[in-house]
């Protein structure tokens, strides 16, 4: 039979039963496969079917129940013959490969951590000092730039220790801060602003850092990609503060800079499993991908286009789509 030669590490074995000695393929599916389904040769999924299966698996559905297996099988049948048992065994073998890779990564991480701890010259380094960022070139020696994550983007926090009370500057400073390291003037679409804001003003900005996340679909969308990717549609602001300058001559100076990014004119979607930046609004599908392709949503719905190859509906942020060849 076919079970003795299967291996979870091979992609082509995704639709065949896992290793079974003498198994005839009738009871190895735990009741998942159809009772009247005949024994067949090894199923080799097509590239389009692999992309759909991987997208569903990566979205969190690693062990679909019987009714969902039927829905997935109907979706895969658009690109070739497939049975319920093939879908069930593909997910079973895919879980085995995922667990094996996870064990290998954990072992490698443990070995690297052990090697790093044994070769460390000093054990007195505090976690805060170990996570400190590099000193920015061109700034005074006491100016340090820290990197932190806000709203899915890298923001920089600049702190300058200034014990001198004679510097009366409270607003505009000559220290240029570009949150994402934009070197050229005007490049990247960033605004530069400096203001002496209080702690309450900076805390008021915190609720708006994540912006209005576009919610397309919902719990009923079976194959929607997870929204936990940090993509937002509103501007991201990154506070960078320095010690304050009160009227007292003995305290330090504080300056806060806010580098805000203009709203992006593109959205991030997944096409054939690859994240891509696509423009908002109508898209010329024919000019972008060619004349003999169609765009299919991960749920199996075909996106309509007009006679000129323009999509008649806008793509949704974070959703997964597939480019397939137009049948001849």
Swiss-Prot record:
GO terms for molecular function: DNA binding; DNA-binding transcription factor activity. Residues 23-33 have a biased composition (Gly residues). Keywords: Developmental protein, DNA-binding, Homeobox, Nucleus, Transcription, Transcription regulation. Residues 38-102 bind DNA. One of its GO terms (cellular component) is nucleus. It comes from Oryza sativa subsp. indica. The keyword Lipoprotein does not apply. It is found in: Nucleus. Residues 1-11 have a biased composition (Polar residues). Belongs to the WUS homeobox family. One of its GO terms (biological process) is adventitious root development. Residues 1-45 are annotated as: Disordered. Transcription factor which may be involved in developmental processes. The keyword Nucleotidyltransferase does not apply. This is WUSCHEL-related homeobox 6. Disulfide bonds: none annotated.
């Amino acid at each position: 039979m076919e079970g003795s030669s299967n291996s979870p590490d091979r992609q082509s074995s995704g639709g065949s039963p896992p290793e079974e000695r003498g198994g005839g393929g009738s009871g190895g599916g735990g009741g998942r496969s159809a009772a009247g389904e005949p024994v067949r040769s090894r199923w080799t999924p097509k590239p389009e079917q692999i992309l759909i299966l991987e997208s569903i698996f990566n979205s969190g559905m690693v062990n679909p129940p019987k009714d969902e297996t039927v829905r997935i099988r109907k979706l895969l049948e658009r690109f070739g013959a497939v049975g319920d048992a093939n879908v069930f065994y593909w997910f079973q073998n895919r879980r085995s490969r995922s667990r094996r890779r996870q064990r290998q990564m954990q072992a490698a991480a443990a070995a690297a951590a052990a090697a790093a701890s044994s070769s460390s010259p000093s054990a007195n380094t505090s976690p805060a000092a170990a996570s400190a960022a590099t000193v920015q070139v061109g700034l005074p020696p006491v100016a340090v730039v820290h990197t932190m994550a806000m709203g899915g983007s890298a923001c920089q926090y600049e702190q300058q220790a200034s014990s001198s009370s004679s510097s009366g500057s409270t607003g505009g400073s000559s220290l240029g801060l570009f949150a994402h390291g934009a070197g050229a003037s005007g490049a990247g679409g960033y605004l530069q602003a400096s203001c002496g804001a209080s702690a309450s003003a900076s805390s008021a900005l915190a609720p708006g850092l994540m912006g209005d996340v576009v919610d397309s679909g919902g719990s009923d969308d079976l194959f929607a990609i997870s929204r936990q990717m940090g993509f937002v549609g509103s501007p991201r602001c990154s506070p960078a503060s320095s010690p304050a300058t009160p009227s007292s001559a003995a305290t330090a100076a504080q300056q806060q800079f806010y580098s805000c990014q203009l709203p992006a004119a593109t959205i991030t979607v997944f096409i054939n499993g690859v994240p891509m930046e696509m423009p908002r609004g109508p898209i010329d599908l024919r000019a972008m991908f060619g004349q003999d392709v169609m765009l299919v949503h991960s749920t199996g719905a075909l996106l309509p286009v007009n006679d000129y190859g323009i999509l008649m509906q806008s793509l949704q942020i974070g959703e997964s789509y597939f480019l397939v060849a137009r049948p001849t």
